[in-house]
């Protein structure tokens, strides 16, 4: 989303060392820099909590100022951080990812890291594209139709960049709440997405590091 297109402007950026836990000086300077109605904190864990507390100490809080985050916020339990209530952050669709997470936990007995689902989608995408002629590969990969994977809708742009539909989550006392659902398809090409979540057995990609029986159970609940 372009801040220019949305008639927004960036008024201040703060930098700090990853080892730093004292944000008093930086936050004080930022708080007095200019009028603003939103603050983005691209961090997580104790640094996020400490920084939010320092903003509140300087009277920077909701409803006058909205806190914005990144997907890194999802790695921190913020249900007790009242200062961050109503704050929002983007995340890949949990409704799509639930299937992958449940199957992974059932098979391997542990919670998958977020990057695992992206790797899974990448392998499935490679499997789908392997049926294409070499001369048509680029067009198939960067086509406007896009794909639907275990993380929801995505497409690869001709520039080499990628677009991924995201949902917006709001911090509440009961945990993250979905306030804006992720698009499940490309609105410009509503009938053209290739769903790569469900591929016939004979077209499955090869898996390494896990036995075939584990993979089959994971995918097909055998």
Segments the model singles out, each with a brief description of its role:
Residues 1-222:
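Extracytosolic ligand-binding ectodomains
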């Amino acid at each position: 989303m372009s801040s220019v297109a949305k008639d927004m402007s960036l008024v201040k950026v703060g930098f700090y060392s990853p080892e730093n836990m004292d944000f008093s000086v930086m936050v004080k300077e930022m708080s007095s820099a200019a009028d603003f109605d939103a603050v983005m904190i691209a961090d997580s864990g104790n640094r996020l909590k400490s920084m939010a507390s320092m903003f509140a100490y300087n009277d920077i809080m909701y409803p006058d100022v909205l806190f914005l985050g990144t997907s890194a916020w999802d790695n921190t339990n913020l249900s007790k951080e009242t200062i961050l209530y109503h704050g929002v952050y983007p995340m890949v669709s949990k409704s799509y990812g639930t299937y992958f997470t449940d199957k992974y936990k059932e098979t391997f007995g542990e919670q998958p890291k977020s990057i695992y689902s992206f790797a899974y989608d990448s392998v499935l995408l490679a499997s789908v594209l392997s049926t294409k002629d070499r001369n048509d590969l680029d067009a198939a990969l960067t086509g406007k139709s896009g794909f639907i994977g275990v993380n929801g809708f995505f497409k690869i742009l001709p520039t080499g960049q990628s677009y991924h539909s995201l949902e917006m989550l709001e911090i509440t006392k009961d945990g993250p709440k979905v306030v804006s659902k992720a698009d499940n398809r490309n609105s410009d090409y509503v009938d053209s997405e290739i769903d790569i979540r469900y591929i016939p057995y004979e077209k499955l990609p090869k898996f390494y590091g896990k036995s075939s029986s584990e993979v089959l159970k994971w995918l097909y609940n055998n």
